Swiss-Prot record:
NCBIfam families: Orientia_TSA56
Membrane-spanning intervals of the chain: 67-87, 480-500
Organism: Orientia tsutsugamushi (strain Boryong)
Basic and acidic residues bias spans: 403-413
Domain of life: Bacteria
Name of the protein in its database record: 56 kDa type-specific antigen
Compartments where found: Cell membrane
Keywords: Cell membrane, Membrane, Signal, Transmembrane, Transmembrane helix, Virulence
Amino acid sequence: MKKIMLIASAMSALSLPFSASAIELEDEVGLECGPYAKVGVVGGMITGAESTRLDSTDSEGKKHLSLTTGLPFGGTLAAGMTIAPGFRAELGVMYLRNISAEVEVGKGEVDSKGEIKADSGGGTDAPIRKPFKLTPPQPTMMPISIADRDFGIDIPNIPQAQAQAAQPPLNDQKRAAARIAWLKNCAGIDYMVKDPNNPGHMMVNPVLLNIPQGNPNPVGQPPQRANQPANFAIHNHEQWRSLVVGLAALSNANKPSASPVKVLSDKIIQIYSDIKPFADIAGINVPDTGLPNSASIEQIQSKIQELGDTLEELRDSFDGYINNAFVNQIHLNFVMPPQAQQQQGQGQQQQAQATAQEAVAAAAVRLLNGSDQIAQLYKDLVKLQRHAGIRKAMEKLAAQQEEDAKNQGKGDCKQQQGASEKSKEGKVKETEFDLSMVVGQVKLYADLVTTESFSIYGGVGAGLAYTYGKIDNKDVKGYTGMVASGALGVAINAAEGVCVDLEAGYMHSFSKVEDKYQVNAFIASACVRYNF
């Protein structure tokens, strides 16, 4: 019995240390598992962002200018939970500012007008011009000549029997296609317009209801003014005749003070002026003269042909440079009015020739008024104007032209002095973007190596980033995109329940800000973590 008691007491004594160790371990686990808070500072380096500006010295137009990026910095705040010894889950918010990048441009300075000057590549200081607004010449209503009026009055409809026999049968608008074309070409009026009260539907142009009809000298006491029509039927010959006569009278009453030749010349000069910066880049010579007031019919024809050839050459030069632009060829297809052809063939007297000249010029103005090809070219040039490489090339050309103008009146000595000064000019950097970012992520951490004084851990995270700031010195709307990150760090036990986390990682963005810049970053942080 004594032996049994001794064995039992010995076993009890041996088991006591193990019980104490278990209790101590349970206490340690209880301290490690629980919530914590973390606060700290962050900094890093941007990677992945590429300039949208093309290097103008690259002949292929594919090389982008290099970016000099800033060093973003900010702070972080997080709350987490130790879910098991060595494993943590965390919800954190990080704020980064100074996410900026600069691109090298020509030497800049501010002139007396407050304009920034840029190096032309040849080295001359010239103001950087804001992109000029490209708009096609506004339509000019030309007076309807007597010949056009008489021609319009006699335009017939396609007979209804013939229209029904056609395959497929012609509707009412196609029956009156010739009259509708006259309205557009000679009067600048669309027969059908959108119905403001019924979206998606068309209606007869209300302008056609404002043309007086009926006897211009009505009887009655007192005499009544000409009737306003309640409706307009384009197939009704009497209504059509009254409409043509009324339009001709109104157009002559409101005709521009300048002659048709002067109006045409001004339009052509404006088009040439608008396209010249682009033509200079493409190496195309653009005429700089309009039409003389005494221009003959042949000169007008030749000028329209010259305009069409120049526009087509410009379009062809940029065909394929950007997507969905400069695709359709330009053919103005100017056709002289029939009355001008007759007068030209008959060798008319001076007064008749002047009338024919005005008729041809007016017809050319109407052609430019309604040219969808010219309107499309302007739209394509607006797209081209936004291209970074073209914009820089236009700035360089403008600066070079100013340099040439200055040097033209200077002597050789001043030119040599200017050249020596230009060789000393350096480069300046222009901010391409300056952004700030707020990032919210869920992160998971796991200890890789653990000692009494420190531990080495790794972690992954995913979340959302809200980016805002300026691009090309213009405010951009806030942009939200997904991010993911990975990190490796060291946690130093500073005091009971307090750790200092030194962490380095990489954050990847899955989308681009304004479809231009993908902002990824290497990030380092120093945080204090307090376990509750």
